[in-house]
Regions:
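Short linear motifs in intrinsically disordered
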Residues: 3-9, 78-85, 114-118, 137-145
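Generic structural detector for well-ordered beta-strands
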Residues: 2-4, 19, 107, 127, ...
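Short N-terminal edge-element motif at the start of the domain
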Residues: 2-40
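A cross-kingdom marker for long, charged
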Residues: 127-167
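Outer membrane beta-barrel transmembrane domains
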Residues: 107-131
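Short helix-loop boundary/capping segments
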Residues: 35-116
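Short, hydrophobic/aromatic-rich segments at coil-to-beta transitions
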Residues: 10-21, 44-52, 87-92, 120-125, ...
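Hydrophobic lipid-interacting interfaces of membrane-associated proteins
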Residues: 21-30, 52-59, 95-102, 131-135, ...
Length: 167
């Protein structure tokens, strides 16, 4: 693994590039580049994480390719000392292509909200596309963004819904 830092990562404007070179974990070959960019401003945390050319190949030849980008922005608590009032907005998209032809695309339809005091995402909608099938996962349902481990999974153009329990 090669890591290149332009400055200490906590400094606004810093960029950390992680490149996997001839790297194996539990005999799986891991490739690609991960770039973390610190875009923080005015005391609020803001950063991106981008993976390009991600690829995992298992000893049996199976595996997948992955590309994605995530934007994280502090939306509450930046002006206070305790972290318990902090909350973050997460947006992004990714594409995973499995060797067998399955393609999974994830895209935030509305920002995912993660409060520090809550172990689950409390609001936001994630679009999940598996080949041609489209699903939506609404983290705000059924309690309008309150902290709970429930989310509404919708598919078939909204004709089917199921309230699911998150781990």
């Amino acid at each position: 693994i090669v890591i290149h830092l332009t400055a200490p990562i906590r400094r606004p404007g810093a960029v950390m590039t992680i490149t996997f070179v001839d790297f194996y974990l539990n005999r799986a070959h891991i490739e690609g580049t991960k770039v973390l960019s610190n875009l923080s401003e005015n005391g609020n945390i803001k950063f991106t994480v981008q993976v390009t050319g991600g690829k995992v190949t298992f000893p049996n030849g199976r595996g997948y390719k992955y590309d994605g980008i995530k934007y994280v922005k502090q939306i509450q608590g930046g002006n206070t000392r305790p972290i318990r009032d902090d909350a973050y907005s997460i947006e992004g998209r990714s594409k995973t292509e499995f060797n067998g032809g399955l393609v999974v695309n994830l895209n935030t339809e509305s920002p995912l909200i993660k409060k520090v005091v809550c172990p689950w995402i409390s609001n936001g909608v994630l679009k999940i596309k598996i080949n041609s099938r489209v699903l939506f996962l609404d983290y705000g349902a059924p309690n309008n963004g309150n902290c709970d481990n429930k989310a509404m999974l919708t598919w078939n153009n909204g004709n089917n819904q199921r309230l699911i329990t998150l781990p």
